[in-house]
């Protein structure tokens, strides 16, 4: 896991860590002893390791650069990362919460709530790289700069995968960026307005808020 930076949830040892409590306690203790923690988001297809919260400042310091990013991303790279996260993960999470897949025809499924949680390309759409460049390259720099300096760096770090002119979710995109912290800030913030202006409106609400409202309506 340390060498790969992430492992799929389907890996036998990852599956064991997620279901075997004794194994997980031992794993967490071993990671904690060296200042690390396992990052697990049930909606992400991969797990990862990261520095434990209490060692962030001793390791990185409280510099301005660390406050912006602890993986060495520039402001432009970080801005594009958030845009891509919003375009891929926000609709993906909505599909996951509603137990829908990209191939669904929109018809209601009476058994949808009992369906297993889907991951990967079943629920995560891909972005056209050409479309992304047309919409956002003018504000981030010229096309060559965005392709060579921004997208290439995000792909190198594992946040995205570039295949056949399309941008796909990388193994770290969903697991390292916290949906609960970011979703409302994007949906109700300036970025949501910017995305709408270029033809990529975000979902109207946080997917978890919609589910809570549905459950509340069912109780009454």
Predicted regions and their residues:
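Short, amphipathic alpha-helical interaction segments positioned at domain boundaries
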Residues: 57-72, 175-220
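Short recognition helix of helix-turn-helix/winged-helix DNA-binding domains
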Residues: 46, 50-115
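Long compositionally biased, domain-poor regions of proteins
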Residues: 29, 64-71, 90-94, 137-138, ...
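A short, conserved structural fragment
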Residues: 31-41, 155-168
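Eukaryotic partner-binding/assembly regions in large regulatory complexes
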Residues: 1-76
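Short acidic, hydrophobic short linear motifs in intrinsically disordered regions
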Residues: 2-18, 95-136
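Short amphipathic alpha-helical interaction segments
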Residues: 21-27, 140-157
